[in-house]
Structure formats: C-alpha cells, structure tokens
C-alpha cells in the first residue's frame, strides 16, 4: 500500500522509473517497520512486486518469492526469479523482502517492451505453486474457480493491455 501510494503521489514529473521503483520499495520498508512496531508491537515482513507501465514499456522490481509472468503470442514466460534459499528437508527461506530493516543496494529493476493484448500476471507463491500451468490457458475467472482451499495465501493480479 505504501509503495503504491508513493508512486501515485510522486510519478508526475519524475524522470526515472528505476529510481521511482527503488524509492517506493524503501518507502514500503519504512512503513512496514513503523506499522509493525506501533500497531502490533512486533517485527513484520512481506514479499512484494511492483511495476510501472508507460508507453508499452514495463519497469518492474520484486523482493522475495513473488512472480511476474508475461503472456503474449510467444506463450507464457516468467520475468522474475525467486529470492529464496533451499535450507533442506523441503524447506525454503526468503532471502529478500521488505521488513523494516533496510534493503540491499542491488535491488533488481528490469524493463520489458509490451504490445497490445499482452497479459501480465503478478502471483504470490501460494498461487504459482498450485496453478502456474493454468495461467497460459485460462482466464482469471477460471483460475479463481479452480482454487478452492489452498495451503497458503493466494493472490493473483492480471493486467491486460
């Protein structure tokens, strides 16, 4: 929420989408620290994916194991890589997130050209772990119906151009 508000409030007149995305992540990192301490008296953290689309270019960044997919005439492709570490015994740990302790300096920001009728999907691990193959063939309504009782929180945002 803080990251989106930052972009909405500061985008006009801004000349670098890369800087805007990095600053939005830093704003979200500060906001989550404050909210955790003030409202819940504990540390909090979350994974995040953000994008700015301008003139059929998408600038995007992410922290953690959220994914951004592009579906177009060439098929379905994953645009992000998971920030996770396999710790053994089927367990993984997120290696990057926003949790109010500052961000690494090497925040990934990438850009990709888009065309009309492209679809971009933002997915949490709860979604892509059980439904990744559905993205290429079904609509968001069909995907929602297929997920009844997931083991993890499930979030999917679809953007159609």
Regions found by a protein language model. Give the residues of each.
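PP2C/PPM-type serine/threonine phosphatase catalytic domain
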Residues: 1-161
């Amino acid at each position: 929420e803080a990251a989106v508000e930052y972009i909405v409030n500061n985008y006009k007149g801004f000349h670098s989408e890369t800087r805007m995305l990095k600053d939005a992540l830093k704003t979200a990192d500060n906001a989550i620290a404050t909210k955790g301490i003030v409202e819940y008296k504990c540390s909090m953290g979350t994974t995040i994916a953000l994008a700015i689309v301008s003139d059929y270019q998408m600038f995007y960044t992410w922290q953690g194991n959220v994914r951004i997919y592009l579906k177009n005439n060439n098929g379905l492709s994953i645009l992000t890589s998971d920030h996770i570490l396999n710790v053994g015994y089927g367990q993984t740990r997120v290696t990057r997130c926003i949790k109010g302790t500052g961000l690494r300096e090497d925040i990934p920001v990438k850009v990709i050209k888009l065309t009309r009728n492209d679809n971009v999907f933002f997915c949490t691990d709860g979604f892509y772990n059980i439904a990744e193959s559905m993205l290429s063939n079904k609509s968001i309504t069909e995907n929602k119906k297929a997920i009844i009782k997931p083991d993890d929180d499930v979030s999917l945002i679809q953007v159609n151009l």
